[in-house]
C-alpha cells in the first residue's frame, strides 16, 4: 500500500479562478493501494479542489490543452506526464496559457 503524501499544488495564469482564486494548496493525499501519480492527482483535484467549470481544466483524464504542468519546476513531458509517480513534498504547478483578448 502506498503511504500518504504531502504535495504542494499551485495554479496560475488564470487557472486559479477555477479554484476560488486560491493559488497555493498544501495537499495531504491519503494512502491507497496504488502509488499516487498525476492521473490520480487530477481525479483528486477535480473532486476536492475544483470549484467551477471543470471543462476548463480537465479534458478526459488529463488537463486541457493550453495548461502547462510543471513538476518540481520541470516540464511534465520530461517526467512521464500522467504516469509520473508523486513523491512526498513534490510541487506541481498548473499554468493556464489561454487568455481572452
From Swiss-Prot:
It comes from the Eukaryota. The keyword Secreted does not apply. GO terms for molecular function: sulfur carrier activity. The modification 1-thioglycine is found at residue 101. Keywords: Cytoplasm, Isopeptide bond, tRNA processing, Ubl conjugation pathway. It is found in: Cytoplasm. Its main location: cytoplasm. InterPro entries: Beta-grasp_dom_sf (IPR012675), Mopterin_synth/thiamin_S_b (IPR016155), Urm1 (IPR015221). There is a cross-link at residue 101 (Glycyl lysine isopeptide (Gly-Lys) (interchain with K-? in acceptor proteins)). GO terms for cellular component: cytosol. Pfam families: Urm1. GO terms for biological process: protein urmylation; tRNA thio-modification; tRNA wobble uridine modification. Pathway: tRNA modification; 5-methoxycarbonylmethyl-2-thiouridine-tRNA biosynthesis. Component of a complex at least composed of URM1, CTU2/NCS2 and CTU1/ATPBD3. Belongs to the URM1 family. This is Ubiquitin-related modifier 1.
Amino acid at each position: 500500500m502506498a503511504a500518504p503524501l504531502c504535495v504542494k499544488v499551485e495554479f496560475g495564469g488564470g487557472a486559479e479562478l477555477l479554484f476560488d482564486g486560491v493559488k497555493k494548496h498544501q495537499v495531504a493525499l491519503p494512502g491507497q493501494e496504488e502509488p499516487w501519480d498525476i492521473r490520480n492527482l487530477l481525479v483528486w483535484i477535480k473532486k476536492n479542489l475544483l470549484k467551477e467549470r471543470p471543462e476548463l481544466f480537465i479534458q478526459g483524464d488529463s488537463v486541457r490543452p493550453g495548461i502547462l504542468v510543471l513538476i518540481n519546476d520541470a516540464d511534465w513531458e520530461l517526467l512521464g506526464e500522467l504516469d509520473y509517480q508523486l513523491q512526498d513534498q513534490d510541487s506541481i504547478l498548473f499554468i493556464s496559457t489561454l487568455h481572452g483578448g
